[in-house]
Amino acid sequence: MNMIKEFLNYLRYERNRSELTVRTYERSLEDFESYFNNRDSQLSWESVDSDVIRDWMESMMDKGDMASTVNNCLSAVRSFFRFALARQLVSRDPAYAIKGPKKQKPLPQFVREDEMNRLIDVPEMWGDSFQDLRARTIIILFYETGIRLAELIGLDDKDVDFAAHQLKVTGKRNKQRIVPFGNELEGALREYIYLRDQEWSTHDVPALFLNDKGQRMTRYQVEVIVKKCLSMVTTIKKRSPHVLRHSFATAMLNNGAGLESVQKLLGHESVATTEIYTHTTFEQLKKVYENAHPRA
């Protein structure tokens, strides 16, 4: 029995891995074996070294394989060598210290400033009903404060300080932060609360945003509202509350806000989390370059 089959049987019968997992490992190991045999017919599982493994990974990246695919293949080779070393089928483990490629984080999608301005400012976008006013207020609040969906749903009337123009927001792990807001959101909130209290004059729910039954809104209900509203002005695939959070951060940075200030407003523990939004400032830099460089 060859070494690969012995390892696959170990996965099946001793580790009780699914057949899908076993087949995935088999393909990765056979691919690596084919690679090093084609590279040098004298190479074997015993003689391959870390450089051969790294070259194999690089060849996959050159073919256009995603980092996640390369990491999965490397995981199979690592597992194989651990097994082979434990069974004394090889004398060393060349995959031990090899690190896989970092997965590229997708850039956050956001709604452009002109699209958000059209959505909020154009009267024809909205009706006069309680539902329309509530939807517009939710959109403005998300875009003006950058808070998370769960944070918006969790807002109570007592969390809104009109005098100080600030919200008390309860974020992840019940951490609280103060988020400022402007005159536009104040006006929208005051109008919404007035109409809400007429609609539900006897409600005893402390929530700021109530659904059509007078109860605290659910995640799904807010998601439906946001998706419907964003569909009126943008063609991006994701049209979620989190996209409005991205849009807030993008607009702040593009209009001169400092990274650490945006970090605090978003409630990020690390500024590294906020740095992903700096991709949008390239658009601003490109415009500056095109307007200023004589040869652009």
Regions found by a protein language model. Give the residues of each.
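Conserved catalytic core of the tyrosine transesterase superfamily
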Residues: 1-296
